[in-house]
UniProtKB/Swiss-Prot annotation:
Residues 290-386, 447-542, 630-747 are annotated as: Disordered. The gene is ZDHHC8. It is a multi-pass membrane protein. Residues 35-52, 170-190 are lumenal. The active site is at C134. Keywords: Acyltransferase, Golgi apparatus, Lipoprotein, Membrane, Methylation, Mitochondrion, Palmitate, Phosphoprotein, Transferase, Transmembrane, Transmembrane helix. This is Palmitoyltransferase ZDHHC8. The lineage of its organism: Eukaryota, Metazoa, Chordata, Craniata, Vertebrata.
Length: 765
């Protein structure tokens, strides 16, 4: 009567088996003590030997039927067939020797019972080839112990027959002394044996029939094969042989050993300090095989040691270099990658485990601030490490570290710009005067672009992403810091001698322009447009991505182009104006963009194309064409003009008295090499985009005689010339080789008046 571990001991279960054992052993003992001695002397000594052998055989089979495993199937795990527990049908059919046998789902053991298997309600187990649960042996009778139960019945029946028979012999021989003790005890044993003889003999006969027919008690009672064919029968002889002589079926449930494991695990399986407190391993067996679930409970010591372990189990951070030192391999920045850094220090605070994949935060000052009078070190005086370049202090700010673009990309790279000359400085000063005067008179404020002579190399935008235009301490880039740098670079800062400023190379510049030292901005001689400090804009684009910044820049360029076109239209159809042509390109291509990435973005017409057009009556006035062509030749020869003529022209412009030419004319000497604009240009367009027209409304007056003698001008009637306004008719050359004019020369006297704030006005009298 095996019991599963953990089940409680119930005394009521052992009353039948204890009674059966007591009656069996007690009656047999009394028989051997009081009856067998006389039978040995009177009948034969073989009588006690025979009864003794049968009695031992009964006890052996009784013990085997009681304590042997009947063939219990182990229960399924809680999670083994969890889905099948809800979706499985109640029955399944299997084919046994060509006959369909139904299997039922066991809700307790969580599997389909095999054929001839049944769940015992007393033992609460599924037993293979379940016959019945016998209370006299306190065990289920199944495949593994049915043989011993059957032999117990046979031997017990034989023993009871022998006890009753030999006891009857003894009583018949002692009939005159029934009151004697021996006769009374023999009669009591016969009564007990006779009392149990009828059921035992009946039960033995019943099982003999079941064995010969190959059935079990459960199948016979339930009537499974009552009207059909039993697929499990082997014939009469085969069935008896299978029950008595077949090998013992295997056992499916193995109880865990009660003794602790003698073998002790050593490293690397367990740590040495936890061997003493390690819990025993638990091994679970199932019908599907051995399950490798070695569950080990965690002891308090192991949990304490887990608390002592560091939580940061990630890869270690790279070693820190000494502050202010850079490796030998970090001296030259790579020109192919975008270089940007905010701090020259390489030390960073320790990174927590949850932030170990974020960029390091430098602990030193970001970008050193220098006043207007201080000098800031340029990129040529500082060598940056590779890791300092790429470890930006951008936690949530966009990174401007853009890669170089190919010609098919967003923007094209440009060749390095030529060095500035003195003509750039003077031409910039003259344009500053004309721009301020035009702005005072109500004209549109248009950003002046650097003028470039024909045939010269294209000038890239300087000062757009200069070293002094880096983001401030928190790493944000503002609209003003991108377009209006605060302080010139290329100098040293006495306030911060040890800190360096990292340079930023724009993706729109040529790679060859990275290593060039920054050029100082042109000094303007205008008292109005001098350098004045400007507060940065409060609006900042801190958390914008590259795409948004590019769209903002494109919109700014589009607005600039529209403003240029409006200014051009106003100058074409206004009363008076000033025309500054970057080169002698055709006006017909003014609104067309360049096909190549290196071509100019906008092309404006020259003076000869503008005057020779249909609106200017070039076809109807050949003299006007001759005058304008002379101006174009003077413009193309402007870079070769000597500095003496340039200074003379500047002196004439600044003279307080009358000067040659009207206020609407400009000397061709001004068409020199390009100079940087007062307002930075957009990096999206690098061609010679022209500031086409700056118009001023000036009253006209007759010119002086000196102007008549020195510079013969193109005279136009006061009303219109060939249907055009007077301002457009005065587009002839201001200085050039004398030639015949198209109409009588018109002479005006120009006076120079100084206004408020140092502004100089040119008034025609």
């Amino acid at each position: 009567m095996p019991r599963s571990p953990g089940t409680r001991l119930k005394p009521a279960k052992y009353i039948p088996v204890a009674t059966a054992a007591a009656l069996l052993v007690g009656s047999s003992t009394l028989f051997f003590v009081f009856t067998c001695p006389w039978l040995t002397r009177a009948v034969s000594p073989a009588v006690p030997v025979y009864n003794g052998i049968i009695f031992l055989f009964v006890l052996a089979n009784f013990s085997m039927a009681t304590f042997m495993d009947p063939g219990v199937f182990p229960r399924a795990d809680e999670d083994e067939d969890k889905e099948d527990d809800f979706r499985a049908p109640l029955y399944k059919n299997v084919d046994v020797r060509g006959i369909q046998v139904r299997m039922k789902w066991c809700a307790t053991c969580h599997f389909y019972r095999p054929p001839r298997c049944s769940h015992c309600s007393v033992c609460d187990n599924c037993v293979e080839d379940f016959d019945h649960h016998c209370p006299w042996v306190n065990n289920c009778i199944g495949r593994r112990n049915y043989r011993y139960f059957f032999l117990f019945l046979l031997s017990l029946s034989a023993h009871m027959v022998g006890v009753v028979a030999f006891g009857l012999v003894y009583v018949l021989n002692h009939a005159e002394g029934l009151g004697a003790a021996h006769t009374t005890i023999t009669m009591a044993v016969m009564c007990v044996a006779g009392l149990f003889f009828i059921p035992v003999i009946g039960l033995t006969g019943f099982h003999v029939v079941l064995v010969t027919r190959g059935r079990t008690t459960n199948e016979h009672v339930t009537g499974k094969f009552r009207g059909g064919v039993n697929p499990f029968t082997r014939g009469c002889y085969g069935n008896v042989e299978h029950v008595l002589c077949s090998p013992l079926a295997p056992r499916y449930v193995v109880e865990p050993p009660r003794l602790p494991l003698a073998a002790r695990l050593k490293p690397p399986f367990l740590r040495p300090e936890l061997l003493e407190r390690a819990a025993p391993l638990k091994v679970k067996l199932s019908d599907n095989g051995l399950k490798a679930g070695l569950g080990r409970s965690k002891s308090k010591g192991s949990l304490d040691r887990l608390d002592e372990k560091p939580l940061d189990l990630g890869p270690p951070l790279p070693p820190k270099a000494e502050a202010g030192t850079f490796g030998g391999d970090l001296q030259t920045p790579r020109p192919s990658s975008a270089e940007s850094a905010l701090s020259a220090q390489r030390t960073s605070p320790p990174t927590p485990a949850m932030y170990k994949f974020r960029p390091a935060f430098p602990s030193g000052p970001k970008a050193p601030f220098c006043g207007p009078g201080e000098q800031v070190p340029g990129p040529d005086s500082l060598t940056l490490g590779e890791d300092s370049i790429h470890s930006l202090d951008f936690a949530s700010e966009p990174s401007l570290d853009l890669p170089d673009y190919t010609p098919g990309g967003l923007h094209a790279a440009y060749p390095p710009s030529p060095p500035l000359s003195a003509a750039d400085t003077f031409s910039g000063a003259l344009r500053s005067l004309s721009l301020k005067a035009a702005g005072r008179r109500g004209g549109d404020h248009v950003a002046l672009q650097p003028l470039r002579s024909e045939g010269g190399p294209p000038t890239p935008h300087r000062g757009i992403f200069a070293p002094h235009a880096l983001p401030n301490r928190n790493g944000s880039l503002s609209y003003d810091s991108l377009l209006n740098p605060g302080s010139p670079g290329g100098h040293t800062c006495p306030a911060h001698p040890s800190a360096g400023v990292a340079s930023y190379r724009s993706p729109y510049l040529h790679p060859g322009a990275v290593g060039e030292p920054p050029r100082p901005p042109p000094r303007s001689f205008s008292p109005v447009l001098g350098p004045r400090p400007r507060e940065p804009s409060p609006v900042r684009y801190d958390n914008l991505s590259r795409t948004i910044m590019a769209s903002i820049q494109e919109r700014k360029d589009r607005e600039e182009r529209e403003r240029l076109l409006r200014s051009q239209a106003d100058s074409l159809f206004g009363d008076s104006g000033v025309y500054d042509a970057p080169s002698s390109y055709s006006l017909q291509q003014a609104s067309a963009l360049a096909d190549g990435a290196r071509g100019p973005a906008l092309r404006y017409g020259s003076r000869d194309d503008l005057v020779a057009g249909p609106g200017f009556g070039g076809a109807r006035n050949p003299a006007l064409q001759t005058s304008v062509s002379s101006l174009s030749s003077a413009v193309s020869r402007a870079p070769r003009t000597s500095s003496s003529s340039l200074q003379a022209d500047l002196a004439n412009n600044n003279a307080p008295g009358p000067r040659p030419g009207s206020g609407s004319h400009r000397s061709p000497v001004r068409q020199g090499p390009p100079s940087p604009p007062s307002t930075p240009r957009s990096p999206s367009y690098a061609g010679p985009k022209a500031v086409a027209f700056i118009h001023t409304d000036l009253p006209e007056s007759p010119p002086s005689l000196a102007v008549q003698r020195d510079h013969p001008q193109l005279k136009t009637p006061p009303s219109k010339l060939n249907g055009q306004s007077p301002g457009l008719a005065r587009l002839g050359p201001a200085a050039g080789p004398p030639g015949p004019s198209a109409s009588p020369a018109r002479h005006t006297l120009v006076k120079k008046v100084s206004g408020v704030g140092g502004t100089t006005y040119e008034i025609s009298v």
